[in-house]
Amino acid sequence: MKDTILEVKDLSVTFTQYDRGFSRRTLHAVEKMDLSVRAGEIVAVVGSSGSGKSLLAHAIMGILPYNSAMDGEIRFLGTPLTAERVKKLRGHEIVFVPQSVSYLDPLMKIGDQIRNGKKDHSVKEKCLAVLKRYGLAPDIREKY
């Protein structure tokens, strides 16, 4: 059996919505979701607009909006994904890939988008490592 990379257990995401005065209500956006991703697997999260796909990603990345609350457990490589841990891993071990290609700039070279415009040598090496990890040739950096 392959090692589990990401495990989501009993995940719920709610939002507090404030109305006029002091009244408020709780909206249940994601309820009791389970997900497991093992080494070597490719997993697609599919659903209609508003079904919680992005909220799942935001919960994993630790970037839920201020008026939200999360319940449940998220583990990465067997260890709970705490706020401190996800902050260290975000952008390195765990990366958010937006669901819309409109977030990518068609006028910017691929390498520049990966490097976020930074030019120092260590960032260039990290860019090459990312391309290699996904089986892409180094010269793709110069393409749009």
Would you name each region that the model predicts?
Residues 1-26:
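ABC-family P-loop ATPase nucleotide-binding domain
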Residues 69-80:
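Conserved ABC transporter NBD signature motif
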Residues 80-95:
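ABC ATPase NBD coupling module
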Residues 100, 106-120:
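Q-loop/switch helix immediately C-terminal to the Walker
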Residues 46-48:
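The feature captures the beta-strand-to-loop junction immediately N-terminal to the Walker
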Residues 124-140:
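Conserved ABC ATPase "signature" region
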Residues 61-64:
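Helix-to-loop junction immediately C-terminal to a conserved catalytic motif
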